[in-house]
Swiss-Prot record:
Lineage: Eukaryota, Viridiplantae, Streptophyta, Embryophyta, Tracheophyta
Described purpose of this protein according to its UniProt entry: Component of SCF(ASK-cullin-F-box) E3 ubiquitin ligase complexes, which may mediate the ubiquitination and subsequent proteasomal degradation of target proteins.
Organism name: Arabidopsis thaliana
PANTHER family documented for this protein: F-BOX PROTEIN SKIP8
InterPro entries: F-box-like_dom_sf, F-box_dom, NTF2-like_dom_sf, SKIP8-like, SnoaL-like
Keyword Ribosomal protein: no
Cystine connections: none
Protein name: F-box protein SKIP8
Length: 231
């Protein structure tokens, strides 16, 4: 029986069994000098990278040059920011890219968490280090009292820490916004499940390689027969 030519110019194998032959053909690249793999990887990995967490994405960026380029892609870090923090800032364009914006947001949230740890532990020296030593810093406690300037602010915290015990807040709905060397954080902080939340705004400035608090405003919302808000 005569053999039938194959599409690639070859002929089928002789014998009773069939055998599949895989051939590699050259496909014209639409980008001269760039392999098909390099063209396909960004398209394939963009979706896959959105499933990685922060440590995994950082580790990936330290592998080969191709993966490093993919892991440093702005869209990957924007997706991670939205997954870990909030969708509220979808329309912004960070000056130094989403990777740095993500890292700075983590740093701000860490400092903000430290603030509540200091309150819980009544650590006055740590609170003094957290605040910027400046005459323009402001602190408004839930009582409505305003303290202005570094010395007054720290003295106000000393009075708070002289109470019998520290406060262990449960913090929720944390939202940050960063503008170069300034950031503010809004949140709700609860002392117990029955009471209403404290509505808190903290403002930080970046000085000498560290984020320092420059403004704290706490108002309390009491939920009973009626809702009372202290601003």
């Amino acid at each position: 029986m005569p053999s039938t030519p194959l599409a690639n110019g070859g002929t089928p194998p002789m014998g009773g069994g069939e055998r599949t032959t895989v051939t590699t053909s050259t496909v014209a690249d639409d980008k001269p000098g760039v392999s098909m793999m390099e063209q396909l990887v960004p398209e394939i990995t963009t979706h896959a990278l959105s499933y990685l967490d922060y440590p995994s994405l950082c580790r990936l960026s330290m592998t080969n040059s191709l993966m490093r380029k993919a892991a440093n892609d702005d869209n990957a870090w924007k997706a991670l920011y939205h997954k870990d923090f909030t969708l509220e800032q979808d329309g912004i364009t960070p000056v130094n890219g989403w990777k740095e914006y993500y890292a700075t947001t983590r740093a701000i949230i860490s400092v903000n968490t430290e603030f509540f740890t200091i309150i819980r532990d009544r650590a006055l020296q740590a609170m003094a280090r957290l605040w910027l030593n400046s005459d323009y810093v402001k602190c408004i406690h839930a009582s409505g009292e305003l303290f202005s300037g570094y010395n007054e602010v720290i003295q106000s915290w000393q009075l708070c820490f002289n109470w019998e015990q520290g406060f262990d807040f449960q913090v929720h709905t944390v939202r940050t916004r960063i503008l170069t060397d300034m950031a503010w954080v809004t949140m709700k902080a609860y002392l117990n499940v029955d009471g209403g939340p404290f509505l808190i705004t903290n403002v930080f400035e970046f000085h000498n390689g560290r984020w320092h608090m420059v403004h704290h405003h706490s108002s309390v919302m009491l939920i009973d027969d009626q809702q009372v808000v202290v601003h």
